[in-house]
Amino acid sequence: MTIDITEIMDLIPHRYPFLLVDKVVEIDPNKSITGIKNVTVNEPQFTGHFPARPVMPGVLMVEAMAQLAAILVAKSLGSTKNKEVFLMAIENSKFRKVVQPGDTMHIHATIDQQRANVWKFSSTVKVDGEMAAESKFTAMIKDKS
């Protein structure tokens, strides 16, 4: 099952310039999800990171992983219209390959553990089949107030 950008925008609140998932290419609710982010030179972070050699900031790769996980949460719960997903912890992040405009980030997230409203994930970013980044993180799902 694929999810296009229109449905992604229904599932998570992020918008340009901070929406970092372009498409979901595979999802197994309550288990895992795979999506893509096409990295383009038009993105605002590249005006300063770095002008002579644009490089995707590692923190934005982690954010893309977290956004993909939030989509997985929404699909696993059936909806997050009345819920908010908050990042609680980021652990063991590693950056192994430079990601630059023209690259396609293949992002994968897996649910490692789910206890009540706290979910733990493992996630990776690959470019051209090579590991670019990996991280583990924890999120809390809360009712909207």
UniProtKB/Swiss-Prot annotation:
Which is a Gene Ontology cellular component entry for this protein? cytoplasm
Keyword Plastid among UniProt keywords: no
Superkingdom of this entry's organism? Bacteria
| The entry's keywords | Cytoplasm, Lipid A biosynthesis, Lipid biosynthesis, Lipid metabolism, Lyase
* Known EC number: 4.2.1.59
GO MF assignments: (3R)-hydroxyacyl-[acyl-carrier-protein] dehydratase activity
Subcellular location per UniProt equals:
Cytoplasm
Primary enzyme class: lyase
Q: Output the GO biological process annotations, alphabetical, semicolon-separated.
A: fatty acid biosynthetic process; lipid A biosynthetic process
Which Pfam families does its entry note? FabA
Record: active site: H49
What SUPFAM superfamilies does the entry give? Answer: Thioesterase/thiol ester dehydrase-isomerase
Q: Which residues form a coiled coil?
A: none
Q: Which reaction does it catalyse?
A: a (3R)-hydroxyacyl-[ACP] = a (2E)-enoyl-[ACP] + H2O
Q: State the similarity comment.
A: Belongs to the thioester dehydratase family. FabZ subfamily.
Q: What does this protein do?
A: Involved in unsaturated fatty acids biosynthesis. Catalyzes the dehydration of short chain beta-hydroxyacyl-ACPs and long chain saturated and unsaturated beta-hydroxyacyl-ACPs.
Q: NCBIfam families attached here?
A: fabZ (TIGR01750), PRK00006.1 (NF000582)
Protein name, entry field = 3-hydroxyacyl-[acyl-carrier-protein] dehydratase FabZ
Q: Which gene encodes it?
A: fabZ
